[in-house]
């Protein structure tokens, strides 16, 4: 085999390998582009050709992977949120510590992994457009809301079983936890994006404050005492003053 033919074969193999790698990466690139546009513009205003253009492919290529804009949206939700529930359930199962600690950990972890990311804009999108797209709202309820509530219900039940939490109306106590987190998302993707920099709403301080308020309502007296001790800043060690004995002053 001549050298030129060997070089040509190697070039073709490299080109094929590069094309295959590009093909494998394409669904992820489309999902990233779709997430960006859905959060920026909303579901109704985002056009399939815009997603394709941002991902650097044709509209026909987009529909090879995702047959409709609705299926594309569902894939975005699964990739960024609902696909993580298995991982979160595993973390729940092995968590060591009190349920008060677990509640604080879950709220802060949720913010770091979802709330602080672009994916949190999906929640705002659903809240804004659910009435116009009931099928997508039902999908989000099934894929995100229901499993999320199931994990919170398990956490609250854990607290009641251990005696840390008082007897709760579980179905409604869940909303005491989700409501402040939903507010934080809505603020981030609405007024928070418009107000001057330095607006006094630090997400981590807000979550710590909400967790403390929640625990005051959820905990039994003994559980609240332990939670307060855990959260209270450590006082400086007391110093002891030794007075001289009489006659030795």
Predicted regions and their residues:
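Short secondary-structure transition hinges
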Residues: 86, 112-153, 198-200
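A conserved beta-strand->loop->alpha-helix hinge within the catalytic CA
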Residues: 50, 97-102, 169, 202
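Amphipathic alpha-helical linker/stalk segments
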Residues: 76-118, 122, 157
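Hydrophobic/aromatic residues within well-ordered alpha-helical segments
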Residues: 26, 69, 80-84, 99, ...
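C-terminal peripheral helix-coil segments that are non-catalytic and often amphipathic
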Residues: 1-17, 101, 105, 109, ...
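Basic, helix-initiating cap at the start of DNA-binding domains
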Residues: 1-41, 45-57, 64-71, 97
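Amphipathic, non-transmembrane alpha-helical scaffold segments
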Residues: 23, 31, 77, 137, ...
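Conserved hydrophobic residue
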Residues: 43-44, 136, 165
């Amino acid at each position: 085999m001549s050298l030129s033919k060997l070089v040509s074969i190697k070039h073709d193999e490299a080109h094929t390998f590069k094309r295959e790698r590009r093909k494998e990466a394409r669904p992820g690139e489309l999902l990233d582009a779709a997430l960006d546009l859905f959060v920026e513009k909303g579901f109704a205003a985002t056009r399939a050709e815009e997603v394709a253009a941002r991902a650097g492919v044709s509209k026909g290529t987009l529909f090879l992977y995702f047959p409709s804009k609705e299926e594309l949206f569902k894939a975005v939700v699964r990739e960024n949120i609902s696909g993580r529930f298995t991982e979160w359930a595993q973390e729940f199962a092995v968590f060591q510590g009190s349920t008060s600690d677990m509640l604080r950990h879950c709220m802060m972890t949720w913010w770091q992994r979802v709330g602080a990311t672009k994916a949190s804009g999906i929640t705002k999108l659903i809240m804004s457009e659910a009435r116009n797209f009931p099928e997508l709202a039902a999908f989000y309820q099934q894929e995100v809301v229901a499993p999320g509530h199931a994990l919170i219900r398990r956490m609250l039940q854990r607290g009641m079983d251990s005696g840390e939490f008082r007897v709760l109306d579980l179905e409604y106590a869940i909303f005491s936890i989700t409501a402040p987190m939903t507010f934080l998302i809505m603020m981030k993707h609405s007024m928070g994006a418009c107000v001057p920099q330095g607006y006094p709403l630090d997400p981590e301080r807000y979550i710590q404050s909400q967790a403390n308020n929640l625990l005051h309502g959820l905990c039994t007296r003994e559980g609240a005492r332990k939670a307060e001790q855990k959260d209270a800043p450590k006082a400086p060690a007391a110093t002891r003053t030794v007075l001289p004995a009489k006659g030795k002053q």
